[in-house]
Each structure stands twice: as structure tokens, then as C-alpha cells.
């Protein structure tokens, strides 16, 4: 037998090292497949756990001024929760905030569906990741319809794969996370700057002075004109309510200006008294593209709302004082079975009772 030379020994050692490295990486790859890490190819800088897949929507920038569909979840969270996106802009804001809060409370990962991302991401710097449609369709969901207030059972939901539904928009779900919610619903810079530019141009009509206080006014009209009286035995805010709400602010704030937005701007111009020179009809009333109106409202100091989730969220994000329309249904309304005023309006907000006389007139034989 030929004695091994020093060169042969070195080559043998290198061969053993190469084989060991191949074995190690093969084992690592197999382990990653078992634990779902192969799905991270959709977001190559993130790791996700099977059967969850997240993907970065096309044409989504990754600058600080954008929402991120591929954030990293804390390692302590598990499972997959999502919520069915239903309704319009304010409804989906409520669904997003509720999903985020309940998932955190139960130690679960929260994901939104592409339709919700398409609604909210153009406006806000949201961070919840997006669930791929094929994963949504193949996940063994348990479904749970939420009512619109926090309940004890929602704090102890053991389901690892849960799809929520409903129209939750109650502060009782998420107010303990207020700073996080405000961060999630931070406007993109261009929307905030455009809204502030509009406000900077406003002047008080009589003096020409710049306003000291901006009060956003959201007047919900549209489909509520039929839905409230016919289905819910309720009313929308009328001109008397808006006058009283404005007088409340005039008595408490120096030189306010009222920035009116609505999906019924023509009605507002005809029914809101602007003779004092402190009412500005600034909204464009485009229901399909509500971003500009919403941004305007959130950049004001205070809020007057009538009814609806759009007005709620404008007030919640703006902070300051909020006046809302209170007791806007008859006592026997079916609406009160799904809506609790004490869970809908923050305790410090100020309610002004609605005029229900049109409903009594309708009820007369």
C-alpha cells in the first residue's frame, strides 16, 4: 500500500468538508420546507409560517411613506387570523382596527385580504400583511361574526385559523391601542400635505383673518336618507342639529372655521347657514374616492359628525372635541339591537339629541 502524501491528506480533508457542508444545507432546506419557510420566496426578506403566505402587491413602493404588506410578526404570535372586508371606507377601517386588536389580545398573527389592502393602503401607512388568495381558499377557517362591541368571549378565542366578519367599529375593541391605531392610520404625506394646503388657504369671511381653530364637519346623506327612516326608524342630522353643534364650538373656541364635507354637498350649501363667514364648503363629495374629504377632516382640530363610520373615524383620528348626533332612532328601533351608543361614542364626546319628530309624523295613520 502506497503511503499517503501530505497533498493527498489535504485533498481528503477538503472532500470531507465539502460533503459535510452539502449535508448540512440539505438538512436545513428540508427543515425549512417542513416549517413553511419556503413560502418566504414571496417576500424574500421575511420568514413566514405555513400555511400562511404573504405577498407584496405589484407596484407597491417600499419607501417609509407607504404601507408595508410584508412586515415581520413577533415570534410569540401564532396562527392566522383575518377579517372579511365588507362595506365602504369607514367600515373597513373598523374591521382593520378590530382585527389588529383582537389578534394581539389572543396572541395570533393578523393578515388582511387583498380587497382591504386595496381600499386602505392608498390612504394610510398600514402594516398588516396581505394573505394570498390561494392560502385564503385552502385554509381550514372557523368563521366568527362579530357584534359591534367588545365582549369577554372575544378575549379568549382559541382558534388558530379564524376569519372574522361583521361591521365592528367600536372603540371598546381597540381604544387601549390608541397610539398604535393612530400610527396604522397615518396618512401618506401627499394626502396630509394637500389637506393642510387647503386649510392654510381658508380665511374668515368677515375679517379675512386666518382661522385659529378648524372644525371638520361631516354630514352623512346619500343612502342613509332612505335607510334610516325606512329600515331603522331613525333620522340623519338636519340643519337645526348642525346649527346647534356649530354654536357649541363658537361658544368655546375663538374664531373657528367650519370645514364642511358631505356626500350631499348641494344639500349642505342650501341648508347650512354660512352668513357668519365661518363656514367653508370644502368637500368634493366623491363617495367612490373619499380620501380627500377624509384627509381634510383628520387635519382639523375638532369634529362635528352626524352618523356613520366615516365621521367616527374622522373624529377619532383628529382628536380634540367631538360633537355627535345622539338618540337618532326611536326607542323600539331594531337598530339598537346591533348598535350600542355607549360603545360607539367615546365618553368624552358630546351628544346633541336628534329631532325625531319626522318619524312620529310618518308613524301617524
Curated annotation (Swiss-Prot):
Glycans are attached at residues 65, 301, 327. This is Galactoside alpha-(1,2)-fucosyltransferase 1. GO terms for cellular component: Golgi cisterna membrane. Residues 1-8 are cytoplasmic. Keywords: Glycoprotein, Glycosyltransferase, Golgi apparatus, Lipid metabolism, Membrane, Signal-anchor, Transferase, Transmembrane, Transmembrane helix. It comes from the Eukaryota. It catalyses: a beta-D-galactosyl-(1->4)-N-acetyl-beta-D-glucosaminyl derivative + GDP-beta-L-fucose = an alpha-L-Fuc-(1->2)-beta-D-Gal-(1->4)-beta-D-GlcNAc derivative + GDP + H(+); a ganglioside GA1 + GDP-beta-L-fucose = a ganglioside Fuc-GA1 + GDP + H(+); a beta-D-Gal-(1->3)-beta-D-GlcNAc-(1->3)-beta-D-Gal-(1->4)-beta-D-Glc-(1<->1')-Cer(d18:1(4E)) + GDP-beta-L-fucose = alpha-L-fucosyl-(1->2)- beta-D-galactosyl-(1->3)-N-acetyl-beta-D-glucosaminyl-(1->3)-beta-D-galactosyl-(1->4)-beta-D-glucosyl-(1<->1')-N-acylsphing-4-enine + GDP + H(+); a neolactoside nLc4Cer(d18:1(4E)) + GDP-beta-L-fucose = a neolactoside IV(2)-alpha-Fuc-nLc4Cer(d18:1(4E)) + GDP + H(+). Belongs to the glycosyltransferase 11 family. Pathway: Protein modification; protein glycosylation. It is found in: Golgi apparatus, Golgi stack membrane. Its EC number is 2.4.1.69, 2.4.1.344. It comes from Leontopithecus chrysomelas. GO terms for biological process: carbohydrate metabolic process; fucosylation; lipid metabolic process; olfactory bulb development; positive regulation of cell-matrix adhesion; positive regulation of endothelial cell migration; positive regulation of endothelial cell-matrix adhesion via fibronectin; positive regulation of sprouting angiogenesis. PANTHER family: GALACTOSIDE 2-L-FUCOSYLTRANSFERASE, GALACTOSIDE ALPHA-(1,2)-FUCOSYLTRANSFERASE 1. The lineage of its organism: Eukaryota, Metazoa, Chordata, Craniata, Vertebrata. The chain crosses the membrane at residues 9-25. One of its GO terms (molecular function) is galactoside 2-alpha-L-fucosyltransferase activity. Residues 26-365 are lumenal. It holds the Pfam family Glyco_transf_11.
Amino acid at each position: 500500500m502506497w503511503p499517503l502524501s501530505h497533498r493527498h491528506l489535504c485533498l481528503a480533508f477538503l472532500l470531507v468538508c465539502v460533503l459535510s457542508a452539502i449535508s448540512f444545507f440539505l438538512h436545513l432546506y428540508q427543515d425549512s420546507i417542513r416549517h413553511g419557510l419556503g413560502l418566504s420566496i414571496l417576500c424574500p426578506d421575511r420568514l413566514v409560517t405555513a400555511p400562511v403566505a404573504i405577498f407584496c402587491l405589484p407596484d407597491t413602493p417600499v419607501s417609509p411613506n407607504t404601507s408595508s404588506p410584508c412586515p415581520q410578526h413577533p415570534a410569540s404570535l401564532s396562527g392566522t387570523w383575518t377579517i372579511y372586508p365588507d362595506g365602504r371606507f369607514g367600515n373597513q377601517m373598523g374591521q382593520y382596527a378590530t382585527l389588529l386588536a383582537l389578534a394581539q389580545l389572543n396572541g395570533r398573527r393578523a393578515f388582511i385580504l387583498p380587497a382591504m389592502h386595496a381600499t386602505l393602503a392608498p390612504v394610510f401607512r398600514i402594516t398588516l400583511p396581505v394573505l394570498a388568495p390561494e392560502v385564503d381558499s385552502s385554509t381550514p377557517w372557523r368563521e366568527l361574526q362579530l357584534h359591534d362591541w367588545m365582549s369577554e368571549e372575544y378575549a379568549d378565542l382559541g382558534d388558530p385559523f379564524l376569519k372574522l366578519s361583521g361591521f365592528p367599529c367600536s372603540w371598546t375593541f381597540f381604544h387601549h391601542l390608541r397610539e398604535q391605531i393612530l400610527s396604522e392610520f397615518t396618512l401618506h404625506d401627499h394626502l396630509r400635505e394637500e389637506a393642510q394646503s387647503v386649510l392654510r388657504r381658508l380665511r374668515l369671511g368677515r375679517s379675512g383673518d386666518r382661522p385659529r381653530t378648524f372644525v371638520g364637519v361631516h354630514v352623512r346623506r346619500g343612502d342613509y336618507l332612505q335607510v334610516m327612516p325606512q329600515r331603522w326608524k331613525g333620522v340623519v342630522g338636519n340643519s337645526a342639529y348642525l346649527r346647534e353643534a356649530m354654536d357649541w364650538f363658537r361658544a368655546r373656541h375663538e374664531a373657528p372655521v367650519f370645514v364642511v364635507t358631505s356626500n350631499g354637498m348641494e344639500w349642505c350649501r342650501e341648508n347650512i347657514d354660512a352668513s357668519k363667514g365661518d363656514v367653508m364648503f370644502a368637500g368634493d363629495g366623491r363617495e367612490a374616492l373619499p380620501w380627500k374629504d377624509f384627509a381634510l377632516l383628520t387635519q382639523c382640530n375638532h369634529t362635528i359628525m352626524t352618523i356613520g363610520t366615516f365621521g367616527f373615524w374622522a373624529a377619532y383620528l383628529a382628536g380634540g372635541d367631538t360633537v355627535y348626533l345622539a338618540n337618532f332612532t326611536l326607542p323600539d328601533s331594531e337598530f339598537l339591537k346591533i348598535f350600542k351608543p355607549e360603545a360607539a361614542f367615546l365618553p368624552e364626546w358630546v351628544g346633541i339629541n336628534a329631532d325625531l319628530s319626522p318619524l312620529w309624523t310618518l308613524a301617524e295613520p
